[in-house]
Amino acid sequence: MIDSYKLSLVIPMYNVELYIERCLNSCINQNLSPNEYEIIVINDGSKDNSLSIVEKIAQKYTNIHVISQINGGLSSARNTGFKNARGQYIWFIDSDDWIEPNVLKTLYDAASQNDLDILRFAWNIVDEKNQKYSDSSDAIHMPIYNKCLSGIEYTKKVLGTVLYVPSFLYRREYLLEHSFFFKQGITYEDVEFNTRIIPPASRVMSIPQICYNYFQRNNSITKHISQKTIENLSFILTKLIERKRTFSECKNYFDWLIDGFICWGIILCSEGNIETQKLFINVLKKNNIRKIRKVKSLKNKVTSLFFNINPWFALLTIKYLRRSYKFIKYKL
């Protein structure tokens, strides 16, 4: 077994028998030799045939390592992969997604030659009809492509950008040095993780190459509404407010994120019960949030218009609209 690699690809896996082979094959079809990178698959208690599919493929490649654990969720599986990784840089890849052919050398060279803590790259969204859509934040990153910035400067310049973990490469020593692990048991782990680790980084860069394909399934976990989802939303909102104070130079970026999460919370809570709604409204009151200003999308502008009159008015109005006009259910 090799002591160190250039890259570690960490793939958490749970019940993805329909997609894991595509994901693994994309990681194999690369332009680094097998002794230069490793693929770590974390079987997070899968109950389908995912594990047998991976084990069959792993028999053919010495750089594929499989670790099984009791189901602990996405963050737990990512942390397990991180703890076992030996690469200079780590790429966290979701098991129903796939990466572009022959991108590993490009990513490693960009990260290592610029001595980066974090590298961000472009990605596609692919729906179940195999329609591809470019990441909408590409235009935002264009002015800073191939420019090495501090984490603070980078964060200030990417207002409107989705902080999607698989679209970043992370230097392992940077994560270890600061004990940057994923928060377990929450839904919005990508935002929580990246808003914690990007601002304090010394060297961050974006490159324009499309390296990743995000598969958007209709039954995505982020589309399910439950009280736990609202509790997680309240948790991440509180964290973002704290980080706006800690990283005050990035106030505009955190304001945009906070306002977006408030709008999302109002939309979700409009379908929830009174206890769920009270929980979310109390979080807003506790943090003295009364107005929404920094939103861009039409759905958020409509939501903010109602919210700025009164949060309860926003909840009741959106609930009425979504139930009275079914087509709005998919637009708000």
Positions of PLM-derived features:
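Cell-envelope/extracellular polymer assembly enzymes that use nucleotide-activated donors
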Residues: 5-8, 26, 38, 192
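Short, well-formed alpha-helical segments that are part of the catalytic scaffolds
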Residues: 16-30, 53
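A conserved acidic beta->alpha catalytic loop
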Residues: 43-52, 70
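Glycine-rich, basic loop-to-helix element that forms the pyrophosphate-binding segment
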Residues: 69-85, 95
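Donor-binding/catalytic cores of nucleotide-activated saccharide
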Residues: 74, 95-205, 215-225
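Membrane-interface aromatic/basic loop that binds lipid-linked glycans or pyrophosphate carriers
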Residues: 273-332
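Catalytic core of nucleotide-sugar-dependent glycosyltransferases
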Residues: 209-217, 223-249, 264, 272-290
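Short aromatic/hydrophobic "clamp" motif used to bind/position activated sugar donors
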Residues: 90
